[in-house]
């Protein structure tokens, strides 16, 4: 008989989920619109977790470009919720991340992840740093977070903040 073939594992990238960060619902973008249009923090958490679970399979890899969550009881929340999300999770550390709390929930934690054609960072790399990388190796797309609703710098940058990827 014919053998079923396993789907290729995929890599997904997301950043700045800010799980449990109630105050982020008050933040406005540069046009004065709310950055995140959710009624409350539970609704925001649920939406992001549902979206994640709807596209990521257990064999997939998820690169999180930092700023995972806020608030108290981090480890309890991570254990009850984040740990159940599918995928092999890798973290590029963000400016709000506590490695001690997050380490048990990620396969690895890096300051950046360098892969063929891509460099994953939390904040966008300075253009001179990116130019330097291009001189020695093949050109890379800098996949980053941190800037939320703001546009990426000109050039080979891609923002994967949840606000810019439909929270998925």
For each feature predicted by the language model, list its residue ranges.
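Short, Lys/Arg-enriched N-terminal segments with co-localized hydrophobic residues
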Residues: 1-7
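Short, well-ordered loop/turn elements at secondary-structure boundaries
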Residues: 7-8, 137
């Amino acid at each position: 008989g014919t053998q079923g073939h396993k789907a290729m594992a995929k890599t997904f990238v997301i950043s700045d989920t800010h799980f449990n960060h109630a105050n982020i619902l008050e933040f406005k973008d540069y046009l004065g619109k709310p950055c995140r249009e959710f009624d409350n923090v539970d609704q925001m958490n649920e939406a992001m977790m549902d979206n994640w679970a709807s596209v990521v399979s257990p064999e997939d890899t998820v690169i999180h470009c930092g700023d995972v969550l806020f608030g108290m009881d981090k480890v309890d929340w991570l254990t009850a919720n984040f740990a159940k999300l599918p995928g092999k999770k890798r973290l590029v550390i963000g400016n709000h991340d506590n490695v001690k709390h997050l380490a048990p929930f990620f396969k690895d934690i890096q300051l950046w992840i360098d892969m063929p054609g891509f460099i994953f960072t939390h904040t966008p790399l300075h253009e001179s740093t990116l130019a330097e990388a291009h001189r020695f190796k093949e050109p890379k797309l800098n996949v980053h977070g941190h800037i939320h609703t703001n546009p990426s710098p000109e050039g080979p940058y891609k923002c994967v903040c949840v606000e810019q990827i439909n929270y998925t």
